[in-house]
Amino acid sequence: MARIFKFFVFLLIVFISNVLLLVESNEGDNSFSSKSIQLSLVSNWGETPSYLEAAEFLHNQDKSLFWKFIEEFNKIDFSTNYSDKIYYESTISLMKSVLSSNTQFLSEFLSIDLAMRTYSPRVETYRQLAISNMKLNNIEHSITTADNKTITLFNSGGWVQIKNKIITDVNEINESLFKDVAVVDDEENEFIRLYDFDHIFPTLANTVSSSSSSPSSIPIVILYVDIKSEFFKLVHPKLKQFSQMGKIKYCLRYVVQESNQKLNLQGYGYELSIKNLEYKVMDDSAIKKDIIIDGVKSKTIINIPNEDVQGFNFHKLQKRKPELTSKLSTFRSYLMAKSQEAKELKVWELKDLGIQSAQKIIQSGDPLRSLEYISQKFPTLSNSLSKITLNESLKSVIESNQKIIPSTTDQTLLLNGRLIDTNELSPIELSRIILEEYEHSTTIQQQGPLSSKTVQDIISAQLPIRIQLLPTKEELELNGGNEPFVSLNNLELDYIYRQWEPKLQSSVLDKPVTSPQDIFIRKNLLTTVIVLDWNNINTFEIIPEIQEMVQGNSLIPTRIQLLFNTKSNNNNNNNNNNNDQNSQTSNFIQGKDLAKVFLTIKNSNLGNRGAFFFITALNYFKKMYIPNELGITRSVLSSSFQAVLQQMGGSVRSLQHALTNTDFDNLLESSNQLIERLELLDTTTSQSTTTTTTTKILPKVFVNGVQVKYSNIDQLSFDLLVSLYDEFDNLKPLFKESILSTTTAQYYETILTSSYWKDNNLPFLKKLNSMISNEKYSHLITNSKNRNQEVDAQNVLKNLLYFRNNENKDEQNLLNLIVIGDFDHYNTRDISLELLRQLEKGELKNCKLTFISNPIDINSVVNTAGNENQILGKLITILKHYGKILTPQLVIGLFEKVQSDPTIIDSFKTMKQIIELSGFDIAANDIWVAQSVNLFKQSSKVCKQYLGIQSTNKSPLSILVNGRIITPPLSYDDAASFIQSDFKLLLEIEMIKAKKTFELLNSDPILKDKSNLKISDLLNKVQSLVGYYYNGNNQLDSNIKRKRIPNSLSISFSHKPPTLSSSSSSSSSNSNDVPLKFLMIINPFNKVSQKLVPMVREFSNKLNIPVDVILNPPVSLSELPLKTYYTYVIKLSSEFNNENVLYNQPLGIATDIPEDRVVTLALDIPSSWLVQPIIAKYDLDNIRLKDLGDEQVLTAVYELENIVIEGSANDMTTDNAPAGLELLLNPISTQTNKTQDTIVMNNFGYYQLKSNPGIWKLTIAPGRSSDIMDMVDHPNQKEKETFVIVPHRLVVIDSLYQSLSSLSVVRKAGQELRPILQPIDEYEKQKEQEKEQKLKQNSSGFFSNLFSSKNDATDSVATHQKKSNLDTIHIFSVASGHLYERFLKIMMLSVVKNTESPIKFWFLKNYLSPAFKEFIPEMAKEYGFQYELVTYKWPWWLRKQTEKQRIIWSYKILFLDVLFPLDVPKIIFVDADQVVRTDLKELWDMDLHGASLGYTPFCDSNKDTEGFRFWKSGYWRQHLAGRSYHISALYVVDLVRFRRLAAGDQLRATYDQLSRDPNSLANLDQDLPNYLQHYVRIHSLPQEWLWCETWCDQESKSKAKTIDLCNNPLTKTPKLENAVRIIDEWTTLDNEAKEFELKIDQSKHHRQIELDHQNQLPNSKPIENIDDILLNLAESQKDLF
């Protein structure tokens, strides 16, 4: 019994011990690590001074402020060597001194830009300009001074460039200025070439374009100078004086001292993804203990950490059995992987995790900070979050919000209603947007001054303009009495809406809409009409969006009706003189036929679902087969129709039946008539289905006749919902007046035929007048960045003579009418005369009227009669000065006299004649008459440059109505009818707006002077600014989009910055009248939110901007939504240490990462950055914080290696992408002298080149490309006659971020039909000729060597010569992580030892460790091979991969045509984990039989893995149709043929289509070429070229030419174990590589220590106060969770 009891106790102890161990192993998910990861990113250029960056900030804001800053800076005494802090504080102080009271806010933005180093690339560009200028002048860095001292030219203070010589002696400058500038310079001279960013001293000659002394006729003098130097103090005043005299054009360029210190950058993030350890990928030598051998640290001893993993202490086991270290390490990794799997949440625990997370955020003391914390640390916090008791009411609120928020919208960021694109948002871009919006708001506020609330109320005021979108009786009769609309749904009858509220509740009608439920009513109260032009391919893009509205998860409370246009605007078929075009377009299906097929399917038993599926199929087949065509071909239509029948069946008989069906002819004709009558289509050229024009026009959408404004198709559902809520509120008065009721039969007709709109002076149009619907504004005043231009503009605008109705002197003059035009033109005078007449009659009420001359051609001096031009325009310019003696009647009289005889205007020879004709009491020699010419030129300049209005022969005049630009058409019958009809209607609309604005201004609490005159003047300015900034087609930036959020959306929480919160109780409200507010709709689990939230929070706290947040998490989850940790690096303040040295080191510090988790690090960087790690002790691909041992911080430093230039090229001759065009990027003023080359892709004409700050020259490469194409200077010119051919284009890289550029090329005469890519038959012929030539040379060499004598020494030389004469074999490979780099070294050794020919290795740089990049040059020297590191930035248009492994796979196949220089003819890809056993020359020379790719088929001989051969069954078997499925571990690419076939374009286009489905392309690098081998042919290599144990039997191993370590899905054995077991020579090669690495470590040790001291990079070790930072982080986060 006692034995049984003891045994039971023993079992219990074992059980408890194992349970405790299991609990301990699973605690990692909730236990925070005390260790952290510290990452920094530095520039590859040297530090730049903060005061120069500040000067560039000012130059960017206002050039006049820049020169004020320079003048003040020149007064500072720099004899003392000041600290960074003194320079910084002096710069900020100096900045404030040159700013006016209205622009002091700029100092805050300066401090932000200094912290972000925004202008450092610009300063670096100046540094490179100065260096290149010295090289250009053949000047060494060192010069001898007058006292025989040798100093560097940079340290001398500077020099002056005059023509082709430089002057360093101050005493010589005066003489040279008088003597050497006598002859005009050629601005193309590279010595004195100027750039757009240059600092040109402002004088009349270079600021007034109309000056008789053109800037190009003034000699250029460039001062290269250190602005702190004594040289600058002496030279600047001299050059300034000469410039003010108009003698020179003075350009100032900085001389910037070179620096070894690098910039610390920010505006990037990094994620830590939990690693999948199914297959062991950690190097067993990666966890190493440094030991000392002869005083040198060496990494050779594997040291397994002293820890328990699932009950085993592998550290102790290693000590007992050191010979089993490798196997112990493998088993340890296996258990670690199982441990990570055990921490996953169950499905039922995941369901409410989204709501629980939102609940935790809202309940936090600082919700915005909690939002950031949870989104960045979610994997660690998910367990705790899942245990929160669910708040059902919060869930209901979020569900209600999501009825409004489109399902495709995870995040939206608005600033004062401005929609901010968050996908590529950087802190620098967000700072620019905030500054722009701040300037807009404050400019409006300062006009009063006004409160920010008044400004926001004016901005948000909406005026619905309704159109009578109903058919006439005739149009109804044409369609058999039916309306010409195609209905998609019926809210009152369709089953899907059965649960909606059936009646309108009175409580809803008595208050504004506050809940989404308010409008979800089962009534057709809100009807949306969408006008679809079947001749416009955008139709096919919008229909899937419409489908989501009526069939998707987010039903929208509106009846949707489609109105079809099938009447083609394309006249090509009737254009008899363009037979080529006719034949080209005949293959395209007409819009009418497409509409008939759609309607045939819709009216069949397939209904909406079938019709929508048909459009989806059209989209798919079009993008698959004709992605670059803008039309639908017959084959695409046929494939789409067949797809419908195959997928859905249905009763539709055939495509031919649908095309010949006449049932819908009357419907389509009726709808065409309605569209034409109401002018619902834009008259501009649309994106036709039969032509290749590219103007994108969005389909028009109306809600109960009110047009919905939306910026793009993706935003339609959201913007439509906002319009539905607005319209619901608009209809409430109709219910109160019993016009509508719950029993109304036809809501739509009743609403559009009601007299309510006209009775209440609300705009109601009988047709969509484009002049009214297309809003465009100019500004009457603005916060211009050009102060001189602002002063000139206000001088003109404040000196205008306004005409008013004298009988109504008490009128408020709410409308300000300014006629701007060419008064030599009949129409300008005609409209002006009629406006004056109607003003005098009292027809134009509450209006004031004035005129500004704006000639069509300012340089035209004389008219057709040979007399002085623009006499009337010049007279009008000076009318203000005679306002007391002029009346409207006098001016009317003048216009009438001129109009009575139009030829009289050309007969005037002097101003005196027109004054006499006018009867004005003005002396001909009056001073203002004498000044009329200059004033006339000034007013014209203001119109063109400030107001943005150009007079042309087609549009000789424009009328500004409170800033709104109206351009009368030349086709009007007469001026009176135009003004009484269209123009009068527009004035009525603008008057309604003005009255609302007047009320708001009158009630403003800040505005003191509220007299009619003051408010009238204020209103005119405010209306123009609001329209210009917010409501119209913004002239500042047409890409700016604005969005309104319905009031019914519930705000989850509001964030008030600390400054605002602390001062909220202050009595002084004015000081906190912040004109800005963020609104953020955010899904906490979206990857964009991980960087967006910290960015918004940082700017909010820095600039005191409040933030409203609407949380938008998924309401139900089935898997973990975020599996990565994330850290974003942003710091908007500059800090200094105790020595007053700039200590602004933006760092990405990741804390709270479980120590036992294996994570992989991936950078999240801007699209135009290429970076590389330069310091990393540990494997960043396999990070486990426990492996740090005693170290607390894992440090990594990356470097910004290149700034990428991305562009889109267009062949203007054919309007297509010039695919295959070769481009060169040559450095002019940059750090590097290396030329970059690339080819243009067919995909969007995309090209990519690497650069750095400086100036580059983009050219077409010599050869076939330059023989065919020329570069064009003006990419927007469409007329070939205006093309300006240029030899190159200058590219200036002076910012951290580069936007997409455009490049236009045109074909040379006679080259219109010649293909850019050499045809394959030409290529084959050329190849044969080269082969024959080579054979001749080889045979000649053989006979000459046969009779030559040799000795041992010459034998060696000959052997080397023989090898060098052979073709270089180019080997490409990729690797990531220390294990695969170890494999890579072994692969390289196996290649070098077995291949006789010269070898050049190409490695993908992106993921190589710093250690490997330091090692590879030494290995290349030792083993005699070449190598090069290559990279390519993922293009913006190509669907991105997010998982690192899939990104690496992508690089193996997607960019082969552009990854390597154009002179590389062929590459062989060899996997890193492969060993080569043969001479690769055999594979290099192998005939690919016309294919561009050679791959080895998968082995079929190992029957154990038969069940894993997926390509033998199902989809793959059917798709391959007897072709082989190939393995991607080894392949050869004929790059020349590959490019000739545009194979890269086909691979990318197919990838982009297939990758839409996340379940496709599971093995991306392998599946893609195999899938596409029908089009990009693959030559199957003999089987022996690749052997791997997983798929091949053992008998075939002896023939293997390469052996690959394929993963085995049966055993999942780690690769290291397989390598030792399978490959006999692997251990020998591994040891050789290790021994060589040890040898290199020892030889470099002392030299490396010395270099580390000399060139120490910032952040190469943990910063001194890292403990303080971590402590502060822990303290700040303690209350977040």
Curated annotation (Swiss-Prot):
Source domain of life: Eukaryota
GO CC term, one of those recorded: endoplasmic reticulum lumen
Identification of the protein by name: Probable UDP-glucose:glycoprotein glucosyltransferase A
The keyword Glycoprotein is assigned to this record: yes
Function according to Swiss-Prot or TrEMBL: Recognizes glycoproteins with minor folding defects. Reglucosylates single N-glycans near the misfolded part of the protein, thus providing quality control for protein folding in the endoplasmic reticulum.
Keyword Glycosyltransferase: yes
Family designation: Belongs to the glycosyltransferase 8 family.
CDD domains linked: GT8_HUGT1_C_like
Disulfide bonds: none
Top EC category: transferase
Organism: Dictyostelium discoideum (Social amoeba)
Pathway: Protein modification; protein glycosylation
Record: glycosylation sites: N81, N148, N174, N391, N1233, N1338
BP-aspect Gene Ontology terms: protein N-linked glycosylation via asparagine; sorocarp development
InterPro entries, per database record: Glyco_transf_24 (IPR040497), Nucleotide-diphossugar_trans (IPR029044), UDP-g_GGtrans (IPR009448), UGGT_TRXL_1 (IPR040693), UGGT_TRXL_2 (IPR040694), UGGT_TRXL_3 (IPR040692), UGGT_TRXL_4 (IPR040525)
Position of the signal peptide: 1-25
An example molecular function term from Gene Ontology annotations: UDP-glucose:glycoprotein glucosyltransferase activity
EC number: 2.4.1.-
Region feature (Disordered): 566-586
Primary residence: endoplasmic reticulum
Subcellular location, record wording: Endoplasmic reticulum lumen; Endoplasmic reticulum-Golgi intermediate compartment
Keywords: Endoplasmic reticulum, Glycoprotein, Glycosyltransferase, Signal, Transferase
Residue ranges with Low complexity bias: 569-579
Stretches for region Glucosyltransferase: 1346-1657
Cofactor needs: Ca(2+); Mn(2+)
Pfam families: Glyco_transf_24, Thioredoxin_12, Thioredoxin_13, Thioredoxin_14, Thioredoxin_15, UDP-g_GGTase
